[in-house]
A protein has these predicted regions:
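Hydrophobic/aromatic-enriched cytosolic interaction surfaces used to assemble or bind macromolecules
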Residues: 1-293
Length: 293
């Protein structure tokens, strides 16, 4: 189960969410998805498919429900979007630029979730200063590893209050790199069977380097490219590969934001689609149909 600070997240196995659904719901025991979704719909009156937003350092990309082929529209920020879309529901994804993770997972002690979060928070404070004391945390675990992800740069409580003032309900908040990672696994079935592999999710200069062991996520590291270019990404991949992988370990790259990302023939990775463009490629568009889970 994933947990946010001291409250269990209402999410299915495999999700990584900084969830901000109604506070009293966070105290309930997790139920099977269909029953829980039905109860939520009846009790809270969900208002249909949610809008999807991706928040990055320059604003937000917004996808409206209904037209699956429409490109995302740019807005100055989440609050601006909320004021223009009163009375709606939204699922929010956040750029790797807004997430932090524990670099050395081996340093995490074998404690319970509360102890793990406490240890991780202190590690974030030691590295990033007192501001990290209030960052929302989400823990994840699977058969081979566990980890902690922090949300930095977005005040979720303030955002939720602003949404309430405009009748906007935030259904979920999660890292964009995790959404892209799941799409990479869907597109490259070999990732699920490789003993070791890597997925690099690119968002301009921000990138997430995800390590897999036995087909599941074992480590996440946030990277900052020297510049938003293929050559800079190649240097980062070579450095990460030298640190954590051999030449025979598969590497998959996907994303957007590289100025010359239309030509990736020089990249030492299997590239899904193109890596240029200001916004995520259409095939990576997040679903606006799924309910919070």
């Amino acid at each position: 189960m994933l947990l946010l600070n001291d409250a269990p997240l209402l999410s299915m196995a495999g999700d990584i969410r900084f969830d901000v659904v109604v506070a009293d719901a966070l105290k309930r025991r997790v139920k099977p998805f269909r029953g829980w979704s039905r109860e939520l719909s009846q009790g809270l009156g969900l208002r249909g498919p949610a809008h999807a937003l991706l928040a990055d350092a320059h604003g937000v990309w917004a996808w409206a429900p209904g037209d699956r082929y429409a490109a995302a529209k740019r807005h100055g920020g989440v609050r601006e979007w909320m004021r223009a879309h009163a009375g709606t529901d939204v699922r929010l994804w956040v750029s790797a630029a807004f997430t932090q993770s524990i670099e050395d997972l081996a340093s995490l002690p074998p404690r319970d979730d509360a102890g793990l979060r406490s240890h991780a928070r202190q590690a974030f404070v030691d590295r990033h200063g007192d501001e990290a004391a209030t960052w929302p945390l989400a823990t994840w675990q699977n058969d081979v590893a566990r980890g902690v992800v922090a949300l930095a740069g977005i005040d979720l409580d303030a955002l939720r209050r602003h949404g309430a003032q405009n009748g906007v309900r935030i259904r979920s908040v999660e890292p964009w790199w995790h959404h892209a990672f799941l799409e990479a696994k869907r597109c490259v079935p070999a990732l699920a069977h490789a003993a070791n592999a890597h997925v690099c999710v690119v968002e301009g200069r921000a990138a997430a380097w995800i390590t897999l062991a036995g087909g599941v996520m074992s480590h996440v590291r946030r990277c900052v490219l020297e510049e938003a270019s293929v050559s800079s990404l190649n240097e980062t991949i070579e450095r990460m590969r030298a640190d954590r992988a051999g030449d025979d370990v598969p590497i998959v790259a996907l994303g957007h934001g590289l100025g010359d990302g239309g030509d990736t023939t020089r990249l030492c990775a299997h590239v899904l689609g193109r890596l240029d463009g200001d916004q995520p490629p259409q095939w990576l568009r997040p679903s606006t149909q799924n309910e919070v889970h």
